[in-house]
Structures are given as C-alpha cells and as structure tokens.
Amino acid sequence: MNDSGVSKTYASALLGATNVPEEVEQELGDLAQLLFKDEKVKNFFLSPTVSNEEKEKVLIKNLRGKISDITLNFLGVLLNRGRIIHLPEIQKQFTVELDKKKGRVRAQVRSYPSLEPAQAAKLGSILSEKFKSEFILEVSEDKSLLGGFVVQFNDLKIEKSIASQLGEIKKSMLEKKLPVGAIYEN
C-alpha cells in the first residue's frame, strides 16, 4: 500500500472510531507539529534503536490527560505498526475526510490586492450558495495577478484576475489574423 493509501486508511479508521472528530482533528494537528517540527523529538520517534515500548512510555508520560484517550491510543497503534512517520499525512487526510463528512470545502484564494475580511466573507458566502457546501477560505496575496482573484478547490479553478484577462485578450488577438492586403477602417 502506498503512503497516501496508508494515510487514508488510518485517517478513515480513526474518524469512524471517534465521537469527537473536531477535538481529534485539533490534537492530530498539534501532535504532527510537536513530533515532527523539532529534529531531536522527530529523530527519537523515528529511531529504530529506541524500542516502541520506550516511545510509548514517553508519549503516555507526557500526553496522558492532555489529549483524548482515543488519540493517545491511536498514537500507540501507529508506533506499534511502524506508521508514526505517517502522522503528518494522516492528520491532513483526517481533515479531508472530516470535511467531506461535514460538507465542508477548503478553497485557496489568491488575490491582489489582499482581500479584506468582509470581502473574503462575501466570497465564501457566494461560493457556499453556489456549490451548496460550507467553504473554508485560505486567503493569500499574489502580486503576479495584477488585480482580481483566483479560487481553487477540489479540481476546480475560478480565475477572475487581470493577468488571466490580459492573457485571453492576447490569445484572441493572435487567433484572429488579418488576411494579407486587407484594410479595415472604422
């Protein structure tokens, strides 16, 4: 099974087993950062010379009472099956699966100039109405657009930027070649 298949399998299993998916989603995100951001911590948990029992003791000692039992047990399963390295990808896949279950769509919005919060909220509202889903917008500024915005989600791209409009005009002008010797007057 490839890495994305492993991640999807574990994420789906965890989502099916939990009664508090939003809490688990937050915990997985925090743990993925905690365990894989610091090189010493990452190396400890990925080291083949440290036993899984020792790794599990460290997790239990430091996390019991601070995260839900299901998340702690899940980490133990990942350790014992040699899958802890997949935690960051499992966390991402868990979020994808939870979003599907909740009818949410995460969209990347690039704009120039940067969207004001009210504009982003209005765009989210329009998208939600049009696509019958709750939209979570991840907004960033992109000066290469010259003006306007680009929205990307799933396999869809909505492009309303000056750069794309100029590209369309250029393409249109190049396609409409004038016949040799033709003279046009206004």
Curated annotation (Swiss-Prot):
It is a peripheral membrane protein. It comes from Leptospira interrogans serogroup Icterohaemorrhagiae serovar copenhageni (strain Fiocruz L1-130). InterPro entries: ATP_synth_OSCP/delta_N_sf, ATPase_OSCP/dsu. Coiled coil: none annotated. It comes from the Bacteria. The gene is atpH. GO terms for cellular component: plasma membrane; proton-transporting ATP synthase complex. Its main location: membrane. It holds the Pfam family OSCP. Belongs to the ATPase delta chain family. GO terms for molecular function: proton-transporting ATP synthase activity, rotational mechanism. It is found in: Cell inner membrane. F-type ATPases have 2 components, F(1) - the catalytic core - and F(0) - the membrane proton channel. F(1) has five subunits: alpha(3), beta(3), gamma(1), delta(1), epsilon(1). F(0) has three main subunits: a(1), b(2) and c(10-14). The alpha and beta chains form an alternating ring which encloses part of the gamma chain. F(1) is attached to F(0) by a central stalk formed by the gamma and epsilon chains, while a peripheral stalk is formed by the delta and b chains. Keywords: ATP synthesis, Cell inner membrane, Cell membrane, CF(1), Hydrogen ion transport, Ion transport, Membrane, Transport. Gene3D superfamilies: N-terminal domain of the delta subunit of the F1F0-ATP synthase (1.10.520.20). Signal peptide: none annotated. F(1)F(0) ATP synthase produces ATP from ADP in the presence of a proton or sodium gradient. F-type ATPases consist of two structural domains, F(1) containing the extramembraneous catalytic core and F(0) containing the membrane proton channel, linked together by a central stalk and a peripheral stalk. During catalysis, ATP synthesis in the catalytic domain of F(1) is coupled via a rotary mechanism of the central stalk subunits to proton translocation. Disulfide bonds: none annotated. This is ATP synthase subunit delta.
